[in-house]
């Protein structure tokens, strides 16, 4: 392995995001049972466009409720127009103004399965100071390098502030995240405060959460994995990429099925 240790690699990763002029990505979030089987109903596709100083667009797509041939994919987004931030969640059916971009990103963390926060915490200085970013991972160590989707990557492992295991695969050439994988242990029982928080955003997802937790009789272990398939920095982004249109069909839908 090269002479860089885990702390060096994470610092370089942070600087890459911090110093870039623009950033784009398209990703897929997958959830896996402890036996390695994907829970397909929890799959989420998303994309992020960012251009300094304040152009930001984040969109994500969840599977249809009911028959995929008849039902609509659930498309949600948040974006900026000058100093104002807006959001459109599938469950809300209308565009709403947000108090701030940072608050909008935090609000979307649960429904986007954590994807809205992962890279944004590095790109936005105002957000970086408010959240527990990956730089605060403890017991961080470098493992053997690995190939992910044909890309040569550093492979790191550590623990989050809640003691969950977390792994990172970081593209060597661009020093950008290629994959993040977090271990999650869920104990039986319904967290009523979490249920109410989800319900305030999306009643359907709150119902799904309650039904799932009511069916759980013992602690279960999951893995939440985010794969970054088209991440790039300092690239040209068209003005239309920062615009959300309620009636427009999301170009993430094909990615949802094939990535």
Feature locations, PLM:
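Flexible, processing/modification-adjacent segments and terminal tails
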Residues: 2-9, 16-19, 71, 79-152, ...
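Gly/Pro-enriched, hydrophobic low-complexity segments
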Residues: 30, 64-65, 133-256
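N-terminal mature ectodomain segment of secretory-pathway/periplasmic proteins
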Residues: 2-94, 141
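Glycine-rich, flexible loop segments associated with nucleotide phosphate handling
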Residues: 41-45, 71-77, 119, 209-226
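Short C-terminal domain-edge/linker segments immediately following a structured domain
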Residues: 56-60, 90-94, 119, 185-191, ...
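Short linear sequence motifs
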Residues: 10, 16-17, 43, 49, ...
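Short, charged/polar low-complexity linear motifs in solvent-exposed/disordered segments
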Residues: 42-43, 68, 76-77, 97, ...
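Short, surface-exposed linear segments at secondary-structure transitions and domain or protein termini
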Residues: 52-53, 58, 104-113, 178-179, ...
């Amino acid at each position: 392995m090269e002479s860089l240790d885990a702390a060096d690699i994470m610092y370089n990763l942070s600087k890459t995001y911090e110093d870039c002029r623009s950033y784009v990505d398209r990703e897929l979030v997958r959830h896996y049972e402890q036996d390695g089987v994907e829970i397909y109903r929890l799959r989420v596709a998303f994309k992020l466009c960012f251009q300094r100083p304040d152009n930001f667009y984040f969109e994500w797509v969840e599977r249809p409720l009911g028959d995929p041939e008849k039902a609509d994919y659930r498309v949600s987004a948040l974006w900026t127009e000058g100093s104002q931030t807006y959001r459109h969640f599938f469950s809300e059916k209308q565009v709403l103004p947000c108090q701030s971009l940072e608050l909008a990103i935090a609000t979307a963390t649960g429904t986007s399965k954590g994807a809205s926060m992962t890279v944004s915490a590095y790109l936005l200085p105002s957000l970086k100071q408010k959240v527990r970013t990956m730089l605060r991972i403890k017991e961080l160590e470098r493992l053997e390098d690995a190939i992910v989707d044909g890309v040569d990557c550093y492979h790191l492992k550590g623990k989050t502030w809640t003691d969950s295991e977390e792994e990172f695969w970081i593209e060597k050439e661009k020093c950008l995240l290629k994959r993040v994988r977090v271990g999650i242990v869920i104990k039986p029982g319904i967290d009523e405060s979490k249920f109410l928080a989800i319900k305030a955003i999306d009643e359907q997802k709150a119902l799904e959460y309650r039904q799932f937790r009511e069916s759980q009789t013992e602690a279960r272990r999951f893995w939440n994995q985010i794969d970054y398939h088209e991440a790039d920095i300092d690239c040209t982004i068209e003005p239309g990429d920062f615009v959300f249109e309620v009636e427009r069909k999301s170009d993430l839908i094909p990615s949802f099925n094939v990535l």
